[in-house]
Every structure is written in C-alpha cells, then in structure tokens.
UniProtKB/Swiss-Prot annotation:
Gene designation per UniProt: frr
Protein name: Ribosome-recycling factor
Keywords noted in UniProt: Cytoplasm, Protein biosynthesis
Superkingdom of this protein's organism: Bacteria
Pfam families in the cross-refs: RRF
A GO cellular component annotation in the UniProt record: cytoplasm
Function, in words: Responsible for the release of ribosomes from messenger RNA at the termination of protein biosynthesis. May increase the efficiency of translation by recycling ribosomes from one round of translation to another.
BP term (GO), one: translational termination
Length: 186
C-alpha cells in the first residue's frame, strides 16, 4: 500500500522539476543586459560532436551591453559565428580575428512586451506541470483509499498536497514577477 508521505514527496519532486525547468527557461530569455547564460543553449560542432560554446571558447561579459567570445582554436571562429546567427537570439556577431563580440542592443518596448509574454507562457507551462503532479498524487491517494488507507489520512494528505501546490505556484509567480521587472526596466 502507498503511504501518504511518499505520495506527497513524489509530487514535490515533480514540482521541483517544474520550477527548475522554469528557472532554466527564464535564464535563456534576454532581458536587455549581457549574460553568458544567453549562449548556454547554443551548440557548435567541435571535431564531430555538438558541444556548448563555453567548451570551445572563453565567454565573458566585459560590460553590461556586450559578450566577448574568445575561441581557443582559430578554426572555431566561423563555426561559432554561424551557430549564433542560426540561433534565435537575434544578435549579429562581430569578428575581429581575435574575439567574437556580441553587442546586446537595448530592447524596444514592443520586444519587451514579446519577451514578457514569452515568460508568461513558460510560467503557464510550469504551472500546468505542477497541477498535473498534484492531480496524479490525488489519484494515487484515491487508489490507496481503495486499498485500505483511512479516509482521514487521505484528506489530511490532500490538504498537505494543496499547501505544497500553493507554495510552488507562489514560487512561480515570484520568478515571473522578477523576470518581468527585469525585462520591463529600461
């Protein structure tokens, strides 16, 4: 028989994963200032395998409006440039032979609104995952009642589950509010 604590812990793990997914997704959304994390999702072909740019070059942010990429192998310049151009960053790399520089342009009001909308979409995806985890746990608890779990224990577990759910939804709202503030700050 499944006990309530295990059921709640399993749901909490799934909810943690949803929050981690959201944090990762929000980190890749450009908020107007330079961050090396913008390049985390971009992979380049290095000797037959696809690797992150940070594995083949030093990636730094010399100031708030630019990212500098210094490849360790000169043959990687073109490959890195192409990967950045093919990505959905919307930034054109400048290559001076020594360093690839990415100038982060200030965001227009329209682009800020698009990014805020994209953040809300990612937040909704995470909320749906959390709700699904809660629903699955409640279904498991209902099956456990049929297998002999006392109904009082089930009701208490559902109440705890709701509190956990509310905590995670609040965490998502907090993350979204932070990112929205970051995006909308000129």
């Amino acid at each position: 028989m499944i006990d309530a604590k295990t059921c709640i812990n399993d749901a909490q793990e799934k909810m943690d994963m949803a929050v981690m997914y959201l944090e990762e997704a929000l980190a890749h959304i450009r908020a107007g200032k330079a961050s090396t994390r913008l390049l985390d999702g971009i992979r380049v072909d290095s000797y037959g395998s696809m690797v992150p740019i940070s594995n083949v070059a030093a990636v730094t942010t010399p100031d708030a409006r630019s990212i500098a990429i210094k490849p360790w192998d000169k043959s990687m310049f073109r490959i890195i440039e192409k990967a950045i151009m093919d990505s959905d960053l919307g930034i054109t790399p400048e290559n001076n032979g020594e360093i690839i520089r990415l100038g982060i342009p200030p965001l227009t009001e329209e682009r800020r609104k698009q990014l805020a909308k994209q953040c809300k979409g990612e937040g909704e995806t995470a909320k749906v995952s959390i709700r699904n985890a809660r629903r699955d746990a409640i279904d498991t608890l209902k099956k456990a009642v049929k297998e002999g779990m006392p109904e009082d224990e089930q009701k208490n577990a559902e109440a705890k589950l709701q509190k956990v759910h509310d905590k995670y939804i609040a965490k998502i709202e907090e993350l979204l509010a932070e990112k929205d503030k970051e995006i909308m700050t000129v």
